[in-house]
A protein has these predicted regions:
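A structural signal for short, well-ordered beta-strand segments
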Residues: 94-97, 131-133, 201-205
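Non-heme Fe(II)-dependent double-stranded beta-helix
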Residues: 1-13, 19-117
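Catalytic core of non-heme Fe(II) oxygenases with the double-stranded beta-helix
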Residues: 104-172, 210-220
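A conserved hydrophobic position in a structured secondary element of the catalytic/binding core
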Residues: 64, 73-74, 148, 181, ...
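Short, solvent-exposed loop/turn segments at secondary-structure junctions
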Residues: 23-24, 99-100, 138-140, 152-153, ...
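Conserved double-stranded beta-helix
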Residues: 154-180, 184-186, 190-246
Length: 246
């Protein structure tokens, strides 16, 4: 479901913005559910916060926290991009809410787990990829994702903390968009200088030979498994043997 131009964008630049991929109604429902979950975890003291002053928050294991997330992570165009990068038997590594609260600082550029721990030169083919779901408009002011185009081909270098790269850009777009990011590209969230939270989802995928960030087989309830589609079961790792023909 990717055209040749979209494939070339991923190959050459390491990212692809799919504007307004998600309907307005679904985007609103995802945002409301995400903020409800974030608030509930704060109230119970179980929230996962990071950055200075706990100004950013993740909510993990979304597949087990509402049917709307089960459906979202199977979005066909997004999955087509992941399968193009990681193979037809790719696996869901984690699915999280990511909230940047007002005042959240620039997170700095990085490459995704587990790439920074690999010996160099790192593999020239993608091992992991992320989908960044814009549940708000992503703007220059509220923490839009920054990246250095083409940096996924720098197989030995890593981004240096505090360095401003002349080719770094912020990827802005309307709510309902999904940004596909090769995990090897230098990327990170920027500062939220507004008075409102910037809400997104992170659907992180890996090749089937890699260990996912989350142990879905232990974390996902029997109820979710019982209604899961074949696609969702495969993404969660229930199809444990990789497709040798992929």
């Amino acid at each position: 479901m990717l055209n040749e131009s979209e494939k070339e964008q991923l190959d050459q630049h390491g990212f692809l913005l799919l504007e307004r991929l998600i309907s307005s109604d679904t985007t609103l429902q995802l945002r409301e559910r995400s903020l409800t979950l974030a608030a509930a975890e704060q109230e119970t003291g179980a929230s996962h916060t990071y950055l200075a002053n706990d100004s950013a928050q993740r909510v993990w294991n979304l597949v087990d926290k509402g049917e709307i997330f089960e459906e979202a992570i199977q979005q066909p165009k997004m999955l087509a991009a992941m399968e193009y990068l990681l193979g037809a038997d790719c696996t869901l590594s984690s699915f999280t809410v990511n909230v940047l609260y007002p005042g959240a600082p620039d997170a700095g550029l990085h490459i995704d787990y587990p790439l920074s721990g690999l010996p160099t030169p790192r593999p020239s083919f993608p091992l992991v990829a992320n989908s960044v779901w814009f549940l708000d408009d992503f703007t220059l002011e509220n923490g839009a994702t920054s990246c250095v185009p083409g940096s996924h081909r720098r197989l030995e270098a890593l981004p240096e903390s505090g360095v401003e790269y002349t080719d770094e850009l912020q990827i802005c777009g309307p709510r309902g968009s999904v940004l596909i990011v090769n995990g090897a590209i230098w990327h990170g969230s920027s500062e939220n200088r507004t008075n409102e939270p910037r809400v997104g989802l992170l659907g992180f995928f890996c090749r089937s030979m890699l260990k996912p960030q989350q142990a879905h087989l232990k974390l996902v309830s029997d109820e979710v498994v019982s209604r899961a589609t074949p696609t969702l079961k495969r993404l969660l790792g229930f199809d444990s043997l990789p497709n040798m023909n992929a």
